[in-house]
Design a protein with these regions (language model features):
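Conserved catalytic core of nucleotide-sugar-dependent glycosyltransferases
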Residues: 88-169
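Short, solvent-exposed loop/turn segments at secondary-structure junctions
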Residues: 10-12, 42-43, 60, 84-86, ...
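Short, well-formed alpha-helical segments that are part of the catalytic scaffolds
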Residues: 7-28, 42-46
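Short, hydrophobic beta-strand segments that form beta-sheet elements in well-ordered domains
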Residues: 32-40, 121
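C-terminal catalytic/acceptor-binding lobe
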Residues: 12-19, 163-165, 169-241
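Active-site-proximal specificity loops/subdomain of glycosyltransferases
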Residues: 37-81, 86-101
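A structural signal for short, well-ordered beta-strand segments and their strand-loop junctions
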Residues: 78-81, 119-124, 182-186, 224-227
Length: 241
């Protein structure tokens, strides 16, 4: 199965060149597979130096993810990456090392989805070797980080997140509810700078508070809310096997 790379981005033309596009090139992914989704024509202009296919989508990360699914045909295998991915890393002998062959990883991940009759995969949400498990794949309800995931496109409204903020948590829930499982590779993590300047998200504190409450109201059986020391609202998913 041929795959495409979808990168939603906003105001980071230099960042994407130095990070995600370099990461993909180093990992053996051809530029012809890569689509960068931007908010408007002005943004499209500043991304021209990337020499990738630029698609004018919509504003807002949740809306952009829906646009991406609508853009590609049903059955297309899509790998979604944020624009500031420095590396994908894998756990080896208790340490995180660079995952060098991304083409092979993306291809193998698709084969696993087909084998398990599931439609979305993700990676471990925290880059911390102490908590990760070498070679372990789970199918239970576990959070799939929006920075890097792959899915077989079905273009179903039932799978579209509505929360602007924590849309990746809602996406995880929606796929699990529909398919009875989601694949997470607990030995793979991403090196990136979360909540960096620019990007599609803003006013994170207020957005997280609002999104957390919305998710708790919509999915009370699987969502609980906690607060970090800085007051930031976060969501936990109840593990359902």
């Amino acid at each position: 199965m041929d795959y495409v790379i979808a990168i939603p981005s906003y105001n980071r033309p230099t960042e994407i060149l130095k990070k995600t596009l370099k990461t993909l090139n180093d990992g053996g992914v051809e530029k012809e597979r890569i689509f960068i989704f931007v908010a408007d024509e002005e943004q499209a202009e500043i991304y021209k130096p990337t020499m990738c296919k630029i698609v004018v989508g919509v504003i807002g990360i949740a809306n952009q993810r829906v646009f991406i699914s609508n853009y590609f045909p049903i059955g297309q295998y899509i790998v979604s990456l944020d624009d500031d991915v420095e590396e994908l890393q894998t756990l080896q002998d208790g340490k995180l090392v660079k995952l060098t062959d991304l083409h092979d990883f993306f291809t193998t991940s698709y084969e696993i989805l087909v084998r398990e009759n599931l439609f979305i995969w993700g990676i471990y949400p925290v880059r911390n070797a102490f908590f990760m498990k070498s070679g372990v794949m789970t199918k239970s309800l576990k959070f799939l980080l929006g920075v890097c995931y792959g899915y077989i496109n079905r273009n179903l409204k039932e799978l579209y997140p509505t929360a602007e903020g924590k849309e990746d948590i809602e996406q995880t829930i929606l796929y699990y509810k529909m398919d009875g499982g989601v694949i997470r590779f607990n030995h793979i993590a991403v090196k990136t700078k979360f909540n960096a300047v620019g990007g599609l998200g803003k006013d994170r504190f207020e957005m997280n508070e609002k999104a957390s409450k919305l998710l708790k109201e919509k999915y009370p059986s699987v969502v609980s809310i906690f607060h970090r020391k800085n007051g930031m609202s976060e969501v936990r998913l109840k593990c359902i096997k």
